[in-house]
């Protein structure tokens, strides 16, 4: 009898035990794992995020540099090899760098298949997994033949390939190296070439794919890794990549206030149930989405000092609800919360139209809510003056005149 195999990969520094102000605040990965039924027809696996093991230095490297992602991928792969039988349905879920882990794991399985470890000792099994990872997944061209003691479980696809029933991820973050904001650490530790092999493209062997993306995240080092919507899909497959209200952890979970993240969780669970995931309905009933829930500020604390970059998001048009925008986004836009209104005022500027906006110096970014028509030509002009203490600045920068120490 075919069974479901559920792999859940958590985000950076995320664990089931994490708390905020003494209150439990697990991510959506933990919640999905908890509400998934475990019985003979469905097995589940959870892995905490990078940066959760070892001492302070190890945790900093794991969270900031991405050290540990490769090991997390191999651990989840080994579990799949131990539990998979031909015809089983593989579900991969993840958040943040855990989403990157899940997508990379999907690329690993798509390229190499699953090893048969049933006749090997633990030491032999881990050696085989590491070997297939290093020689079969990382290089651009994997070997065409493996040694005789390397056996692979046949999958149901042409050529014996293993298919992946579903990949569901919240706000994939693909920055494995040190964030660019941390220049010194970047020079010491970051080697982008080391991580180029990670395959996060959506393989044709993935039948169903779902990606929930955060509309309001502005941290530059948390840039999303989107799927290419033009990727070829199986005839019976499906693909949805939707934007949700909130910052990174408002979508993937991790705050004590869960109105927004519960919306992204409920969407993902409903999509997974539709393709065969088994859940406990009493636990699912505890998920309470609120489109007007608290929208947090992730660019605060130490992040306030680092580089920010708003995401390129689609316009908030009701016609896009349910396709590229979640219904939650449009509902919050239409009737915003009283304490955080308005939400993404939107205007598409037609050719020939004019609009004047106030731009303030204090915020890093001034959201305009203006969208332009693709392929059209527009003209822009700026005027006015900003004051930084007693230093006058115009659109071209500090105004010429007497040298002032504050310019340094």
Positions of predicted regions on the chain:
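Active-site- or binding-pocket-proximal scaffold segments within functional domains
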Residues: 1-373, 379
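N-terminus-centered regions that define maturation/targeting leaders and the start
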Residues: 354-373, 377-408
């Amino acid at each position: 009898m075919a069974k479901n195999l559920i792999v859940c990969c958590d985000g950076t520094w995320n664990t089931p035990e994490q708390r905020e102000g003494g209150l439990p605040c697990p991510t959506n990965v933990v919640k999905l794992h908890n509400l998934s039924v475990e019985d003979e027809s469905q097995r589940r696996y959870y892995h905490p995020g990078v940066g959760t093991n070892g001492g302070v230095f190890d945790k900093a490297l794991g969270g900031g540099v991405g050290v540990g992602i490769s090991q997390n991928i191999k651990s989840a792969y080994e579990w799949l090899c131990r539990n998979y039988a031909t015809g089983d349905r593989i579900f991969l879920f993840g958040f943040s760098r855990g989403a990157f882990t899940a997508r990379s794991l999907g690329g690993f399985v798509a390229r190499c298949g699953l090893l048969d470890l049933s006749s090997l000792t633990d030491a032999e099994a881990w050696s085989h997994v590491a070997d297939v990872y290093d020689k079969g997944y990382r290089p651009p061209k994997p070997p065409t033949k493996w040694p005789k003691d390397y056996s692979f479980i046949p999958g149901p696809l042409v050529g014996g390939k293993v298919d992946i029933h579903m990949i569901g991820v919240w706000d994939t973050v693909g920055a494995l190296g040190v964030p660019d904001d941390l220049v010194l650490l970047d020079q010491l530790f970051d080697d982008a070439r080391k991580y180029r092999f990670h395959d996060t493209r959506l393989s044709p062997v993935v039948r169903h794919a779902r990606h929930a993306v955060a509309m309001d995240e502005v941290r530059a080092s948390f840039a999303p890794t989107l799927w290419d919507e033009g990727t070829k899909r199986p005839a019976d497959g499906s693909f949805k990549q939707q934007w949700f209200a909130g910052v990174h952890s408002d979508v993937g979970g991790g705050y004590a206030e869960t109105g927004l993240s519960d919306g992204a969780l409920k969407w993902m669970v409903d999509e997974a149930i539709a393709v065969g995931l088994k859940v406990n309905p009493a636990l699912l009933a505890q998920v309470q989405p609120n489109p007007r829930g608290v929208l947090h500020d992730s660019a605060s604390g130490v992040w306030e000092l680092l580089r920010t970059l708003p995401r390129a998001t689609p316009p908030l048009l009701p016609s896009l609800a349910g396709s590229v925008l979640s219904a939650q986004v449009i509902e919050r836009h239409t009737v915003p919360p009283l304490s955080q209104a308005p939400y993404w005022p939107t205007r598409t500027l037609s050719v020939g139209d004019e609009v004047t906006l106030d731009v303030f110096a204090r915020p890093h970014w001034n959201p305009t809510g203006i969208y332009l028509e693709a392929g059209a030509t527009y003209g822009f002009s700026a005027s006015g003056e900003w004051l930084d203490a007693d230093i006058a600045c115009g659109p071209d920068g500090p105004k010429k005149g007497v040298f002032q120490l504050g310019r340094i």
